[in-house]
Design a protein with these regions (language model features):
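Short, high-confidence coil segments that cap the C-terminus of an alpha-helix
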Residues: 108, 136-137, 231
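Hydrophobic pocket-lining residues that define ligand/cofactor binding sites across diverse proteins
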Residues: 103, 132, 226
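Active-site nucleotide-sugar/metal-binding loop of Leloir-type enzymes
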Residues: 97-110
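A short, glycine-/small-residue-rich helix N-cap motif at loop->alpha-helix starts
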Residues: 90-95, 216
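Short beta-strand-to-loop acidic/aromatic patch adjacent to the donor-nucleotide binding site
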Residues: 108-119
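Conserved catalytic core of nucleotide-sugar-dependent glycosyltransferases
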Residues: 100, 121-211
Length: 284
């Protein structure tokens, strides 16, 4: 029997997660199998710890989860082993950096990150993994949108060049507003509201991978660097995840209605995305 595929799961958490995300995240993880520990059930362990040493419970539980907590799940013909890392409430790029370090340290095959303000389908991992196999992607994200008007998709095409004054490369990101729908869309970068990525890129790139003084988001910057070592970046627009706003969850349906009712000229301002040929999902 072949070795399980090892996946590290992390939730970059700034400490202000809306409660709407809690139940959704629980359902996401329940799809990945039954929680297992080496000696006793986690629930029993937590109860005993809170009873005997409440002042130390949180720190000990965090260490216990990181060392022993894992899910094992068979998807199709492949066996997956899921590990959860508790990073804590820190700056999101720093949280991604720590997750990547753990993925490299423990020889994970994939890193799977879900931001703490996203509402996702229960079977999102299965969908992204299947799409990754179909497309040959090294980084794949579901369709998502910014939380504020005009609610842009976090899908980007880049223009690269050489800065003769500073003697350095530069790149400019352009949002792909009219993206191909129900396709696997190859792109230059995508937002990491949720992302599944292979870990070989961390070995090829020099750390820090996400922390930077650049004036662009850490997710876009990582995609730019990863493509330089041969990675392919895709967005799966066959489904979308909700971005928790106030008070609205920003989904594709909400954005389409916003364009029709408020931003009626948006289709005239943005061209169709043609830089890469989008892949049709099998079965279409």
């Amino acid at each position: 029997m072949s070795e399980p595929i090892k996946v590290l799961i992390a939730i970059p958490n700034m400490g202000y997660t809306q409660v709407e995300a809690y139940g959704n995240r629980l359902m996401n993880f329940m799809q990945m199998g039954n929680f297992q520990t080496e000696k006793q059930t986690f629930a029993r362990f937590a109860d005993v710890l809170h009873e005997l040493a409440p002042e130390k419970a949180e720190a000990v539980l965090n260490a216990y989860i990181e060392k022993h907590g894992r899910y094992v799940k068979k998807i199709g013909e492949e066996l997956f082993q899921f590990y959860f890392v508790n990073i804590g409430r820190i700056f999101t790029p720093a949280a991604r950096e720590e997750a990547a370090k753990k993925a490299v340290e423990h020889k994970m095959d994939y890193l799977y990150m879900i931001d703490d303000d996203m509402i996702c389908p229960d079977d999102m991992f299965q969908r992204l993994y299947k799409s990754m196999q179909q497309s040959g992607a090294d980084i794949i994200c579901p369709l998502a949108f910014t939380r504020n008007p005009p609610f842009k998709p976090v899908l980007y095409a880049s223009i690269e060049g050489w800065d003769g004054v500073n003697k350095s490369d530069y790149f400019i990101n352009n949002v792909v507003m009219n993206y191909p729908k129900n396709k696997l869309v190859e792109s230059d970068a995508c937002g990491f509201g949720a992302v599944l990525m292979k870990t070989w890129m961390f070995e090829k790139l020099q750390a820090p991978w996400f922390m930077s003084s650049e004036g662009t988001g850490e997710d876009i910057l990582f995609c730019y660097k990863a493509k330089k070592v041969g990675a392919r970046v895709f967005m799966d627009t066959t489904f979308n995840i909700g971005h928790l706003g106030h008070p609205q969850i920003i989904t594709e349906e909400f954005v389409e209605n916003f364009k029709k009712q408020v931003d009626v000229d948006s289709a005239k301002r943005y061209p169709e995305f043609t830089k890469y040929a989008a892949l049709t999902i099998l079965g279409d």
